[in-house]
UniProtKB/Swiss-Prot annotation:
Protein name, entry field: ATP-dependent protease subunit HslV
Origin organism lineage: Bacteria, Pseudomonadati, Campylobacterota, Epsilonproteobacteria, Nautiliales
Description of activity control: Allosterically activated by HslU binding.
Documented EC number(s): 3.4.25.2
Main location: cytoplasm
Sequence similarity: Belongs to the peptidase T1B family. HslV subfamily.
Record's signal peptide: none
Keyword Metal-binding: yes
Species this protein is from: Nitratiruptor sp. (strain SB155-2)
PROSITE patterns recorded: PROTEASOME_BETA_2 (PS51476)
Positions bound to Na(+): 161, 164, 167
Keywords of this entry: Allosteric enzyme, Cytoplasm, Hydrolase, Metal-binding, Protease, Sodium, Threonine protease
Gene (name only): hslV
Protein location: Cytoplasm
Class of enzymatic activity (EC top level): hydrolase
Gene Ontology biological process terms from the UniProt entry: proteolysis involved in protein catabolic process
Length: 178
């Protein structure tokens, strides 16, 4: 089973940022340190990142992108439809992956059980082995530091990379602005 990964999404005023580390781990071995686990969807209008099984995540990305196309890029309608499809399909219910999807208006976590969760604060979401470290750091920095969104995500992921053995500090970021 692939452990690893920290993905952090942040939605601010007119900006969305997603970041992820680059470490891929199998058991107690680091297989790769510069993997890309984030991407843009729907012609660059949606940011997405995954944690969990890579093969499962690519299946989820493909399925979600088809739904986005069908819903003309409406993120809210797409995550609801995605959840419905996930729960109907027995194969999908066994996938071992989670995703964060966001734009400048919405941010969601899509769980491995087909749940759609909008963060309580509507701003910050984290998944993966270092997710709680990144989430804690991001909340503290958001509340007490005057950082731009991109720097906040990067610094939070660096903190997670220093604490979580399945996360490194080879960070990649994607940004979306209104």
């Amino acid at each position: 089973m692939f452990e690893a990964t920290t993905i952090l999404g942040y939605k601010g005023d007119g900006i969305a940022v997603i970041g992820g580390d680059g470490q891929v781990t199998f058991g107690n071995t680091v297989l790769k340190g510069n993997a890309t686990k984030i991407r843009t969807l729907y012609n660059g209008q949606i940011l997405a990142g995954f944690a969990g099984s890579t093969a499962d995540a690519f299946n989820l990305f493909d399925m979600f992108e088809k739904i986005l196309e069908n819903k003309k890029g409406d993120l809210l309608k797409s995550v609801i439809e995605f959840s419905k499809e996930w729960r109907k399909d027995r194969y999908l219910r066994r996938l071992e992956a989670m995703m964060i999807v966001l734009n400048t208006k919405h941010i969601f976590i899509l769980s491995g059980t087909g749940d759609v969760v909008e963060p309580e604060d509507g701003k910050i979401a984290a998944i993966g082995s270092g997710g709680n470290f990144a989430l804690s750091a991001a909340r503290a920095l958001d509340k007490h530091a005057n950082l731009d969104a991109k720097t906040l995500v990067e610094e939070s992921l660096k903190i997670a990379g220093e604490l979580c053995i399945y996360t490194n500090t080879n960070i990649k970021l994607l940004t979306l602005e209104e």
